[in-house]
Structures are given as structure tokens and as C-alpha cells.
Amino acid sequence: TQHKLNLVDDYRLSSFWIFVDNVARILTEQYGQISVFEHGAFSDASSTSCGTVHAHLHLVPISFSLVDESIQYDKNLNWQHCKVAEIKDIAGQKEYLFVADRYASQETTGMIHVLDMGVSQFFRKVIANKLGIPNQYNYRTNPMHESATEAATQLREKTQSVISSEL
């Protein structure tokens, strides 16, 4: 496998969507509706990668429109409608933010903003702001280990139950 900083090429692969579909199904069964987002970095040194320096897609169970909240959070950003498979064509070699309120596999449609410069933890800031805890967005200073551990335990149990039922 090849190390990647973003998922622009993977969004066009059926094998990628088989994996994500399984994860999304488990998350939806456990928590309900999920939103999707990616901080699309193109450089190891970019603040957009949020320190992870690995491509990753966020599937997050939330009860509000992350698209609407993202647009409202910073009205200076130029958002446009986009299917995930179109991200590469729209962003080119520039960094981007992508967000969708509904997961629909490779047909997932949301909004994209092509960045002029890197931005760190944008969607964490949006979510924390909406939840009324705007100063707790930073995972470095507020890692929320208890919530993460609880979710990991729930998902481990759910995944084991799904695997057992499919055998």
C-alpha cells in the first residue's frame, strides 16, 4: 500500500467504497445518521492534515447539519456542491475541505471549499462551536479520551456482533 495525504484517488475506487460502506453501516446501526468530512491535505507540513499526516475520512454521528454549520462558521469560505468523485477535478493539487450531511457511498454529495492556505481542525471547530464548547475543539489540549474509549468499546462490541452474525 502507498502512503497518502488525501483520498482524491481513492474516492474513485470501488474497493475503497466496499470498506467504507461496511464501516458506515456499523456506525449508522450504532449511532444513527452520520456526516462525512475530510481535510484534504497535499503536504506533510500542512496544518490542514491536523498533525496526522495520513489520509483519513471522518464519519461522524451528529444530529445537526454539518454542512450548514460549516457554511455559517466562516462566511468568507467559498463552498460549492460536489460529489466525492469530483473532488480531484475541483481541487486539482490544492488542499480542500469536504463535508456532507448524508453518507451515500460513492454517490455521497456535499460541499467543498478549495483552500488558499492550510487550516487546522476546521470541522472540529465547527462541531465544538455548535455544541457550545468552542474552546474544546483542539484534540491536542482536549483529547476527550473518555468519549473515545467509550466509543471504541461500543464499536468493538458492535463489530464483533456483526461479524458473528455474518458467519
List each model region and its residues.
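HIT superfamily nucleotide-processing domains
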Residues: 1-167
